[in-house]
Amino acid sequence: MAPSFDHLRDEDLDEDDFDVDEVDISDIREKYEVQLEQGYDAFVVVDGLPEVNEEQKPKLVKFLLKKLNTVGKTREDLIFMPMGEDGKSLRFAFVEYSSPAEAAAACRQLDLVPLDKKHTLRVNKLTDVDRYGREGRIDDEYTPPKIEEFQEKEHLRSFMADPSGRGRDQFVMFRGESVGVFWNNEKDTPENIVDRQHWTETFVQWSPLGTYLTSVHAQGVQLWGGPSWTRQRRFAHPFVNLVAFSPNEKYLVTWSNRPISIPEEGHPALSVEDDGKNYVIWDIETSKPLRSFAQLDTPAAAEGEAPKKAPKFPWPAFKWSADDKYVARLNPGQSISVYELPRMNLLDKTAIKIEGVVDFDWAPATVQRDGVKSYEQLFCFWTPEIGSNPARVGLMSIPSKQVVRSLNLFSVSDAKLHWQSEGAYLCVKVDRHSKSKKSQATTLEIFRVKEKGVPVEVVDTIKDTVINFAWEPKGDRFVIITTTEPVGATAVPPKTSVAFFCPEKAKGNAVGNFKHLRTLEKKNSNAIYWSPKGRFVVVATVANTQSSDLDFYDLDFEGEKPESDKDLTANLQLMNTADHYGVTDVEWDPSGRFVATWASAWKHSMENGYHLYDFKGEQLREEAIEKFKQFQWRPRPATLLSKEEQKAIRRNLREYSRIFEQEDAERISSADVAVVEARRRLLEEWFAWREAIRQEVAEEREIYGLPADPVADLIKAKTPELATDQEEQVIEEIMEEVLEETEEIVQ
């Protein structure tokens, strides 16, 4: 029975012995404490100011105001700078902004900004100062921090030093629940470096220069590297789905389809400002978030218009300039927002308004245009036809925001932007429709970015639909795949044609006009994979249940050149054709020597595993692996050799090749010798075991009085019996032989 008032003792009711101070209600006070953010969330405290007197104070306030107004709006009368008893300032100021969002932006963008050579600003929210600086939060006595002993970090580029001295590349394989990193051993079994169970929950991904291996988990993203494969960085973005690096590995973007929800107890990396956001941009060096963004809403159809199809999810949603100084985001149909790094403030405080903009893409390298000496990064964009205005392709320079080249286009159904790897060319694949909109054709508009004035060359109209396009890396040739039938989900994929294009020969270093080299018809190909070094290309049929062809081409074949191609800068030759049933992915290694193809269990469960080919299309290795999910070569950073050193290597390439071939032959022969020796050793061990058993059996027979050779003894015992029981028999055999045949005809 529950206790009642009658069960209480008299001493329990004695109020004189009750002390209010002894009751601990700190948990209740903390739970129901009034938060100061409600009244002071638009205030910031600016620390690190120079010491000034009353006469110098107005000048400092005006100078400080210029900095403060770069992120929001405030006035001189909203800046309070306390003065000491000696008439000098206390080196900090209180500033009121017009909104809490501006105050938050000031803390994010002005903190650690230099005011001059000797002073650096520290900006914090007033509410944060009160929250973290109140009584009990800070010790009155100074406690020196514990300085940990210096520990030398592992070299994150150690993978560039192959211990075998053969310059091998590494790759990662994700199969079942296991992730392993291996050295490529060509025909032999890959050499395992590290293999771990449950290393990732969804997928793995290399960083662009190969420094880190990314694992993805429900709690966030982790980066691994070094000889011992320890965790180097951690980014706590709950339920992360996708990851993208900046080209130079300085920054990272994470995305989750679930908006971030900050719990009441807080988050180890994110703040309340990140609540409800989907994207987070991180600084890899510090592992700290720079800024977060929410998912953009799909624009609704205008009244009276048919509802638009849901667009494909854009990834990467944030695109990086080649030097990591800018990151940009598309607001479809309205603008492009360009942010400066690492502050993540909007360039010139405004987005670049481009009516109707559909897509954009940065140049993959910093381009030096003819006659332009100033620094710039370039991106291209395109807009569709709006009313009577034509479609337009533009080339914009950043940070000036100047459109350096534009091109008007008519009767445009769609356009795709394709940069060459060095930014020397931009190809705009334009799908055009006839006036009746019943037929379509494709034109290729090629911008020669490095030439003066950025001239545009139009390649002959292609009547078929172009379904794939790929530039030669560091080159000026390209391959397209076309089809005469509409592209879509069909039971039998349509037949395709593969066309090769290259420039004409020109004097000096000039690049001639682009010309058609050759078209191969009645193919099933749908994907193009160039070697990262150029020259060689694999044209493949992937994710196709009917066909799985792999065609290996050489565009600089050293054999006889057809007369029709004498004036062109290519000599096309099919080197080999392979077949990998169920192939879903193809990837070249960074050296351009090997090609890996694999059938991923993420797409189907038939004959999962990988094949390895050399650049000529000769199969080196085939391995079927159950639940094989992912294969990815480890990227290499750019070479440290100068152009002169690279030219010297090319001049002496034949001599190097002879040395490498000799080393390969020695390695193969030594491997063969090792196999023979191992087999001989096993055979000798077996002979020794057999002899030991024979002696042991002989000793046991001698002990038990048994004959040493039971078979011989048995034959000896049976022979007399057979001689007496059987009579002597004579066996005769008669054989007939035809010596001659004569045929007579009787009439």
Curated annotation (Swiss-Prot):
Example of a GO biological process term: translational initiation
Family matches, as Gene3D superfamilies: 3.30.70.330, YVTN repeat-like/Quinoprotein amine dehydrogenase
Molecular-function annotations in GO: identical protein binding; RNA binding; translation initiation factor activity; translation initiation factor binding
Record bears the keyword Acetylation: no
Broad class of where this protein is predominantly found: cytoplasm
Protein keywords: Cytoplasm, Initiation factor, Protein biosynthesis, Repeat, RNA-binding, WD repeat
Pfam families: eIF2A (PF08662)
Entries under PROSITE patterns matching the protein: RRM
Gene Ontology CC terms, in alphabetical order: cytoplasmic stress granule; eukaryotic 43S preinitiation complex; eukaryotic 48S preinitiation complex; eukaryotic translation initiation factor 3 complex; eukaryotic translation initiation factor 3 complex, eIF3e; eukaryotic translation initiation factor 3 complex, eIF3m; multi-eIF complex
Residues in RRM domain copies: 42-128
Family per similarity comment: Belongs to the eIF-3 subunit B family.
PANTHER family associated with the record: EUKARYOTIC TRANSLATION INITIATION FACTOR 3 EIF3 -RELATED (PTHR14068), EUKARYOTIC TRANSLATION INITIATION FACTOR 3 SUBUNIT B (PTHR14068:SF0)
Protein's recorded name: Eukaryotic translation initiation factor 3 subunit B
Organism: Neurospora crassa (strain ATCC 24698 / 74-OR23-1A / CBS 708.71 / DSM 1257 / FGSC 987)
Gene transcribed to yield this protein: prt-1
